[in-house]
Amino acid sequence: PDLEGSLMVELVLINMARLEQAYPPLILRFDDLSGQQVAARRLSAAEYLPRSLSADRPMPVDKAVSIKLAILDPGERALSYSVSVEQ
């Protein structure tokens, strides 16, 4: 990313259900070498969707949605990350 001290997280969401549904909240988590959480953040659809998509519209079926997030670097202790869909 253009900002010093930031990271770019890129992911693709695909709605594998048989019907359109709301874009889910995402949980972005960073862990240290021992698997302990260093940082985490819950992101609403309005926060992560690109400007070309609206959180007010449903997520289409079987369509890839590319997401790019510029976030602050959680520090050198954060050695791995995961993204999960909030249930």
Task: Give the residues covered by each predicted segment.
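Short, surface-exposed ligand- or partner-binding patches at beta-edge/loop junctions that are enriched
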Residues: A70-Q87
